[in-house]
A protein has these predicted regions:
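Structured aminoacyl-transfer and RNA-binding surfaces used for tRNA recognition/handling
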Residues: 1-295
Length: 295
């Protein structure tokens, strides 16, 4: 649902894809199906507001089931689950009387995104988020590569200079979309506080990784010449991470916007309102810093 999970939220996302491939509900067939269950009393008005939220983030609708006192279901999807499979679904999802379970079906990445958004919205609107708590977690095993949904080309997911898990052998033998990177984040209450990686220090790995992403060695030399040349002399294995001190202070002060704890923050359009930047520069100023503007 998110690569920055807020563990103060007790709701969890359930994968029910395989189950719904055996049902007769056509909108779910051939799609990834995620679900979020919650035990709470929700009015008709609450459901309407949640549906409005769902359509506002791009969902076509928001299917759900309620578990009644006799352990039967109530909801728009009930009739599409065969009677002989209803007990199986209750066990699969861990449902109890009084639970409501919401469904998100789409391509895998979109279904995950929608599930994360619905989980957060339910947690906030039903006041389920734990108060006065800091819940930390490490997030790791990020994918090294991803496929662009528009161009269909493979590119780097995050940092192209990270070490792939499995090294050169993985790059030579595995499906690029199955390769993981040695990358990691520290997250607290849904905020990324620190991000880092084991950096690649091997020339062959760097050349092969960029080749998979569509860059030959000549492009690598031209775009990252300094690093390419440095690798000719060898580099030690190294790793690290960069802490976001401003984000830590934001959490401690319970601020929603990071600009509230930065002395002279830029606006949402990247303007420095105190200094009036960016602004026009003179030809003399450009010469002083050896910048030439070409039309």
């Amino acid at each position: 649902g998110s690569d920055k999970p807020d563990l103060r939220n007790p709701l969890r996302i359930i994968d029910v894809t395989e189950f719904f491939q055996r049902c007769t509900f056509k909108p779910f067939i051939g799609k990834t199906v995620r679900a979020v269950k919650v035990h709470a009393n929700m009015s008709k008005g609450f459901h309407e507001k949640l549906l409005k939220f769902a359509t506002g983030i791009g969902m076509g609708g928001l299917g759900y089931l309620e578990v009644l006192e006799d352990k039967s279901y109530k909801g728009p999807i009930d009739k599409f689950i065969p009677d002989d499979m209803k007990a199986e679904f209750m066990e699969l999802a861990g449902l109890e009387v009084g639970d409501t379970i919401f469904f998100m079906a789409d391509k895998e990445d979109r279904a995950a995104f929608y599930a994360g958004q619905i989980r957060t919205e339910l947690g906030e609107k039903l006041d389920l988020i734990e108060k006065n708590a800091y819940r930390f977690c490490y997030v790791n095993d990020f994918p090294m590569f991803e496929r662009d949904p528009e161009t269909k080309k493979i590119g780097f997911t995050h940092n192209p200079f990270s070490m792939p898990q499995g090294g050169l052998e993985a790059l030579n033998t595995m499906d690029p979309l199955d390769i993981l990177a040695y990358q990691y984040d520290i997250v607290c209450n849904g905020i990324e506080l620190s991000s880092g990686a084991v950096r690649n220090h091997d020339m062959q790995i760097m050349v092969k990784a960029f080749e998979i992403a569509g860059y030959d060695e000549e492009v690598l030399k031209a775009k990252f010449g300094a690093l390419y040349n440095a690798f000719q002399f060898g580099a030690p294995p190294h790793a690290g991470m960069a802490p976001g001190i401003d984000r830590m202070i934001m959490l401690l002060r319970n601020e929603e916007n990071i600009r509230e704890i930065i002395p002279f923050p830029m606006s949402g359009t990247a303007q420095d309102l105190m200094c009036g930047a960016p602004n026009e520069v003179t030809e003399q100023q450009l010469r002083e810093v050896h910048i030439k503007v070409r039309q």
